[in-house]
């Protein structure tokens, strides 16, 4: 049985809709999509693209790229993991959004959508590179959102923070993985230094949430 590309496309579109629903759909963004396909016996391969995007033509471009890829060369059971990382950002870097989708194949249960942040560091590094180019000022803030439901977890803003260093916990409150992923944000020289702390005690069977990281002047 060939892997269901229609279902795959629907999940990508759902991810895009979640990102766009957090902001004005009329605003234009640059976009970066990173897709990594890992198989049981064949070597994994990567589909990667970077383009100027907006809500009208981003989705068809990404979906066409997926359908034109080598997905049809594999059967569904060939895959053991599929990772999708999506980053959207305005040309002046004043706003950025990042989201992740991941599928893991379990031989007893089939395909499951896994929503955790284990491999989110690649986009974090890319965000860091963009931040270095941006001219952020004292009004810059970092907001961590829960995808579902979309609620703000915590906000960092240099102008109302007394210390030079503030920790943002990805999973706060009563979430089971509250201490597993953290960001350190340092304010210096009018810019934000975005650093990652490695996830600790990660467990494959735990529940994790989708997140959007938003940078806004």
Predicted regions mapped to residue ranges:
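Interdomain/boundary linker segments immediately adjacent to catalytic/signaling cores
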Residues: 1-44
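Short, well-structured alpha-helical interface segments that form or flank functional binding sites
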Residues: 24, 28, 32, 81, ...
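Non-catalytic C-terminal interaction segments of nucleic acid-processing enzymes
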Residues: 153-217
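Short, well-ordered beta-strand micro-motif
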Residues: 87-88, 100, 212-214
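Active-site metal-binding core of divalent-cation-utilizing nuclease and nuclease-like domains
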Residues: 45-97, 201-203
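Residues at beta-strand starts and edge strands
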Residues: 82, 95, 137-138, 207-209
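Surface-exposed cleft-lining segments at the edges of enzyme active sites
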Residues: 16-20, 69-75, 104-117
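Catalytic cores of nucleic-acid endonucleases
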Residues: 94-160
